[in-house]
Amino acid sequence: DLHKEYRRQRQMCIRDSPTAIFTFGTAPGTAVTGKPQTVITTNLERRANMEKVGIDYLVEYPFTEETRHMEPEAFVKDILAGRMHAREIVVGPDCSFGYKGAGSAELLSAMARDLGYHLHVIEKEKDHRRDISSTYIREELEKGNVEKANQLLGQPYAIHGEVVHGNHIGGSLLGFPTANILPPPIKRLPRYGVYVSRVLVDGVYYKGVTNIGKKPTVGGEYPAGVETYIFGLEGDIYGKNIEVQLLAFDRPEQKFTSFEELKERIEKDKEFANAYYENHPEMIAQG
C-alpha cells in the first residue's frame, strides 16, 4: 500500500536511472494461508498511483511456491541484482524478504558491494510517535475516519472500478441517478456509511456523495458496493472506469422506513457535501 513512507522512498531514487517499485502480484499472506488478504490498494489502483507519482516501472512478481521458499540471498542476487539490474535499492528499516522473511536491511547492506548496488534505508515516518503503516490506516478506515486515513496515505483513499448497472432505484424512484461499482472482495472498504467524495471520470473531477454498504433500505441480499451520486455529470457512463475518492465521513449506513424518507436524507447528504466543498474548494481545484 502506497502510504507516506513509500512516497519518501520514491523520492530517494536516483532520477538519472529508471525507477521501479517491486511488489508481489498476490499478497504473500494470501498465498501462505490460502485465505484472501484484504488490501487498501488493489493492483489496478496501485498501477494508477504509480503512474501519477512518476514511477517508470511497477514489478508485480508472482508469489509462487518457488518464490516462497527462495533463500533471501538468492532473492537479492537472482532477482533484485540479476533480473532487475538494481543499482539503487530503497527500503524501510524493518523490510523482510525470502524464505520465512529471513532477509533484512542488514543482509542487503552486506551484499551491496559484491553485487554493485547502493542501499538506502529510510526511517519510518511517524504520526504522533506512531509508525505510519498499513495497519494504522486500516484502523482509521474501520472507524470511518477517512480524513485521518488520507493524511496517513498522503492522498485520498480511493476505490477504482467499472460502472455497472444497479437496481436503478436511484434514478427511477428517487430522482438521483447514481454510479455503481463493485470492488473486488480483496478491497479493504471503510466503515459502511455515506461519505463526501471526489469522482474522476474521463480525466475530470466531480463532487460526489458516496454510499458504501449493502443498501439495507432496498432489501434483498447485496454484496458490499459503492454507489455514488455525481454532481453535474450528464450522460451515460456505464462501462467506464472511474475513481471514487473518499474525503469526509457524513453518517453511518442506515435503514429507512420508506423511499421518501431515504430521498429526504439524501438531500441532506448533498447539502453536507456542498458545505464540505465550500470549506475545501481546493479539493476540486487541485484535481
Each model region followed by its residue ranges:
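Short glycine/serine/threonine/alanine-rich loop segments
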Residues: 15-17, 55, 117, 155, ...
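Short secondary-structure boundary segments
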Residues: 62, 93, 212-214
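Phosphate/ribose-recognition catalytic cores of enzymes acting on nucleotide-derived substrates
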Residues: 166-287
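Single conserved hydrophobic/aromatic residue that forms the stacking wall/gate
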Residues: 1-10, 14
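Classical nucleotidyltransferase
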Residues: 69-176, 200, 257-261, 267, ...
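N-terminal alpha-helical segment
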Residues: 6, 130-133, 242
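Core alpha/beta nucleotide-donor-binding catalytic domains of modification enzymes
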Residues: 11, 17-82
